[in-house]
């Protein structure tokens, strides 16, 4: 990923979606971009994978302007549904959004991602982050667009999450592994004679 200009973080933030309101923001952006601009059928855009994925929402001065989705597989993560409102294209918000997504993927210990991009956008993606077209994979089409598959190498994270993590760290909200979670504040010592439910 090309470096994110430090001043971009004064204007943009990218966070994991954890609430229904956050998911509505994601849906609104994707509807504006994919359903309206690209005339994608609803059932193709909202394909049954949203509730088993991690979503990030990009905000510009608190206003939702972009989103992406990550799905998790055994050996790789899959980068999907990157959408920016037209007014945000060509601005540094995309790099803020991708950096946040790549940080989560790296922290989980993944070394690579796959992306399925519209072939016409290959020049944009090849300039935005280090990736390569996957050789031997033929183009494919849906919703009236030609797609290609790309591989994105993810650098090793020095604090990747492991099997031996502190139990509280891995029950914290997605992407907030270094911040004490609600369950840590609810810890009560067992009372004499108490039994597990």
What feature does the model see in each segment?
Residues 54, 109-113:
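Short active-site oxyanion
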Residues 79, 113-117:
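Conserved hydrophobic beta-strand within the GNAT/NAT acetyltransferase core sheet
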Residues 43, 49, 58-60, 68, ...:
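Polyanion-binding and phosphate-handling cores
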Residues 1-15, 106-107, 116-197:
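Terminal substrate-recognition subdomain of acyl/acetyltransferases
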Residues 16-19, 23-88:
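A conserved beta-strand-loop-helix scaffold within acyl/acetyltransferase catalytic domains
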Residues 84, 89-103:
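Conserved acetyl-CoA-binding loop-helix of GNAT-fold acetyltransferases
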Residues 74-76, 112, 145-147:
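A generic structural signal for beta-strand entry/edge sites
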């Amino acid at each position: 990923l090309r470096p994110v200009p430090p001043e971009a973080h004064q204007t943009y933030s990218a966070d994991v979606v954890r609430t229904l309101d956050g998911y509505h923001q994601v849906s609104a952006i994707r509807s504006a971009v994919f359903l309206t601009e690209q005339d994608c059928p609803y059932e193709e855009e909202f394909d049954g994978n949203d509730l088993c994925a991690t979503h990030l929402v990009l905000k510009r001065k608190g206003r939702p302007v972009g989103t992406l989705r990550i799905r998790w597989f055994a050996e790789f993560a899959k980068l999907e549904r990157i959408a920016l409102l037209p007014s945000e294209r060509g601005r540094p918000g995309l790099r803020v959004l991708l950096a946040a997504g790549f940080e989560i993927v790296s922290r989980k210990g993944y070394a690579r991602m796959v992306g399925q991009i519209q072939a016409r956008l290959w020049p944009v993606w090849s300039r935005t982050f280090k990736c390569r077209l996957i050789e031997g994979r033929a183009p494919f089409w849906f919703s009236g667009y030609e797609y290609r598959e790309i591989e994105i190498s993810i650098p090793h994270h020095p604090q990747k999450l492991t099997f031996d993590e502190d139990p509280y760290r891995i029950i914290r909200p997605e992407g907030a592994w270094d911040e004490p979670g609600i369950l840590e504040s609810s810890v009560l010592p067992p009372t004499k004679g108490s039994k597990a439910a």
